[in-house]
């Protein structure tokens, strides 16, 4: 089973969580600009992860609707904020 990721694009910070089997990793980066494909790649690479390593990616936070529906054939699931 491939790992999965969730990214929260906040106003000040971008939080990333990757679940790989029984292990969960988390890291936070300062938010820089609007979310786009390049930004997703940068925040994942900060944790040593590529979109190709993942089964899918969930995204939430501001302007997630601007993101493509997939990156490297990995579906981006847009999650509404609560």
Locate each region found by the language model.
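Short beta-strand-loop/turn "lid" adjacent to the catalytic site in phosphate-handling enzymes
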Residues: 31, 45-81
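Short glycine-rich, Thr/Ser-proximal phosphate-binding strand/loop in the N-terminal lobe
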Residues: 3-42
